[in-house]
Amino acid sequence: MARAILTKELHFEIQNETGLLGQITATLAMSGVYIIHMSAYTVKDKGYFQIITRDNAKAKSALKHLVPKAIERDVIVVEFENKVGTLAPVARLLGSNDIEVQYVYGTSGDGFKIVGVFSTTNNAKAVQIINKESGALGVDSPG
Protein backbone atom coordinates (compact mmCIF):
# COMPACT_ATOMS: atom_id res chain seq x y z
CA MET A 1 0.00 0.00 0.00
CA ALA A 2 1.12 3.57 -0.55
CA ARG A 3 2.33 5.63 2.37
CA ALA A 4 1.26 9.22 2.85
CA ILE A 5 2.39 11.84 5.36
CA LEU A 6 1.27 15.38 5.99
CA THR A 7 4.07 17.96 5.88
CA LYS A 8 4.70 21.61 5.04
CA GLU A 9 6.18 23.23 1.97
CA LEU A 10 7.43 26.75 1.46
CA HIS A 11 5.64 28.56 -1.33
CA PHE A 12 6.69 31.87 -2.81
CA GLU A 13 6.72 33.93 -5.95
CA ILE A 14 9.52 36.22 -6.99
CA GLN A 15 10.43 38.41 -9.95
CA ASN A 16 11.98 36.08 -12.52
CA GLU A 17 15.48 36.70 -13.80
CA THR A 18 18.23 34.65 -15.35
CA GLY A 19 20.09 32.76 -12.63
CA LEU A 20 17.26 32.90 -10.08
CA LEU A 21 17.23 29.14 -9.47
CA GLY A 22 20.97 29.26 -8.86
CA GLN A 23 20.58 32.13 -6.39
CA ILE A 24 17.84 30.37 -4.45
CA THR A 25 19.58 27.00 -4.27
CA ALA A 26 23.02 28.49 -3.50
CA THR A 27 21.53 30.56 -0.67
CA LEU A 28 19.93 27.46 0.82
CA ALA A 29 23.12 25.42 0.40
CA MET A 30 25.28 28.09 2.07
CA SER A 31 22.85 28.09 4.98
CA GLY A 32 23.02 24.32 5.34
CA VAL A 33 19.40 23.78 4.29
CA TYR A 34 18.69 20.30 2.89
CA ILE A 35 16.11 20.35 0.08
CA ILE A 36 13.86 17.29 0.07
CA HIS A 37 11.48 18.19 -2.78
CA MET A 38 11.29 21.19 -5.08
CA SER A 39 9.14 22.48 -7.90
CA ALA A 40 9.92 25.72 -9.69
CA TYR A 41 8.42 27.28 -12.80
CA THR A 42 7.86 30.67 -14.42
CA VAL A 43 4.82 32.41 -15.80
CA LYS A 44 5.71 35.55 -17.73
CA ASP A 45 7.94 37.58 -15.41
CA LYS A 46 7.28 35.68 -12.16
CA GLY A 47 9.09 32.67 -10.72
CA TYR A 48 7.05 30.30 -8.53
CA PHE A 49 8.64 27.91 -6.04
CA GLN A 50 7.36 25.08 -3.84
CA ILE A 51 10.12 23.70 -1.62
CA ILE A 52 10.08 21.08 1.14
CA THR A 53 13.18 21.14 3.32
CA ARG A 54 14.35 19.48 6.51
CA ASP A 55 14.07 22.88 8.23
CA ASN A 56 11.57 25.27 6.65
CA ALA A 57 12.12 27.95 9.31
CA LYS A 58 15.85 27.99 8.55
CA ALA A 59 15.14 28.08 4.80
CA LYS A 60 12.69 30.95 5.20
CA SER A 61 15.21 32.91 7.25
CA ALA A 62 18.02 32.27 4.75
CA LEU A 63 15.87 33.44 1.82
CA LYS A 64 14.44 36.51 3.56
CA HIS A 65 16.67 38.95 1.64
CA LEU A 66 15.55 37.45 -1.70
CA VAL A 67 12.02 36.38 -0.77
CA PRO A 68 10.41 38.59 1.87
CA LYS A 69 7.06 36.78 1.65
CA ALA A 70 7.38 32.98 1.76
CA ILE A 71 4.43 31.09 3.22
CA GLU A 72 4.13 27.56 4.56
CA ARG A 73 1.36 25.36 3.21
CA ASP A 74 0.21 21.88 4.15
CA VAL A 75 0.96 19.23 1.54
CA ILE A 76 0.98 15.45 1.37
CA VAL A 77 4.04 13.41 0.44
CA VAL A 78 3.05 10.04 -0.99
CA GLU A 79 5.48 7.18 -1.67
CA PHE A 80 4.45 4.22 -3.77
CA GLU A 81 5.89 1.55 -6.01
CA ASN A 82 7.61 2.66 -9.21
CA LYS A 83 5.65 0.85 -11.89
CA VAL A 84 3.31 1.82 -14.68
CA GLY A 85 -0.10 3.00 -13.51
CA THR A 86 0.43 3.41 -9.76
CA LEU A 87 -0.59 7.08 -9.73
CA ALA A 88 -4.00 6.37 -11.28
CA PRO A 89 -5.54 4.45 -8.35
CA VAL A 90 -4.36 7.09 -5.87
CA ALA A 91 -5.91 9.84 -8.00
CA ARG A 92 -9.15 7.85 -8.36
CA LEU A 93 -9.20 7.15 -4.62
CA LEU A 94 -9.00 10.87 -3.85
CA GLY A 95 -11.63 11.77 -6.44
CA SER A 96 -14.06 9.08 -5.31
CA ASN A 97 -13.85 10.54 -1.79
CA ASP A 98 -14.65 14.08 -3.01
CA ILE A 99 -11.09 15.29 -2.47
CA GLU A 100 -9.97 17.68 -5.19
CA VAL A 101 -6.29 17.65 -6.15
CA GLN A 102 -5.16 21.27 -6.45
CA TYR A 103 -1.70 20.37 -7.72
CA VAL A 104 0.80 17.53 -7.72
CA TYR A 105 4.47 17.24 -8.56
CA GLY A 106 6.84 14.38 -8.15
CA THR A 107 9.54 12.17 -9.48
CA SER A 108 10.55 8.62 -10.08
CA GLY A 109 13.88 7.16 -10.97
CA ASP A 110 15.49 3.82 -11.58
CA GLY A 111 14.75 2.88 -7.98
CA PHE A 112 11.73 1.23 -6.46
CA LYS A 113 9.61 4.20 -5.42
CA ILE A 114 7.75 7.18 -6.76
CA VAL A 115 7.41 10.25 -4.58
CA GLY A 116 4.52 12.62 -5.21
CA VAL A 117 3.74 15.89 -3.46
CA PHE A 118 0.02 16.66 -3.44
CA SER A 119 -2.02 19.64 -2.34
CA THR A 120 -5.71 18.83 -1.97
CA THR A 121 -8.88 20.38 -0.63
CA ASN A 122 -8.63 18.12 2.44
CA ASN A 123 -5.06 16.98 3.08
CA ALA A 124 -5.74 15.33 6.45
CA LYS A 125 -8.56 13.20 5.01
CA ALA A 126 -6.45 12.37 1.95
CA VAL A 127 -3.59 11.07 4.13
CA GLN A 128 -5.99 8.95 6.16
CA ILE A 129 -7.67 7.47 3.08
CA ILE A 130 -4.44 6.78 1.20
CA ASN A 131 -2.88 5.06 4.21
CA LYS A 132 -6.00 3.00 4.89
CA GLU A 133 -7.31 2.09 1.45
CA SER A 134 -4.60 2.25 -1.19
CA GLY A 135 -3.57 -1.39 -0.70
CA ALA A 136 -7.04 -2.51 -1.73
CA LEU A 137 -6.51 -0.70 -5.03
CA GLY A 138 -3.30 -2.53 -5.81
CA VAL A 139 -0.91 0.29 -4.92
CA ASP A 140 2.09 -1.18 -3.15
CA SER A 141 4.43 0.79 -0.96
CA PRO A 142 8.13 0.69 -1.71
CA GLY A 143 10.33 -1.73 0.19
List PLM regions with ranges.
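A conserved regulatory-domain signal marking ACT and ACT-like small-molecule sensing domains
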Residues: 1-143
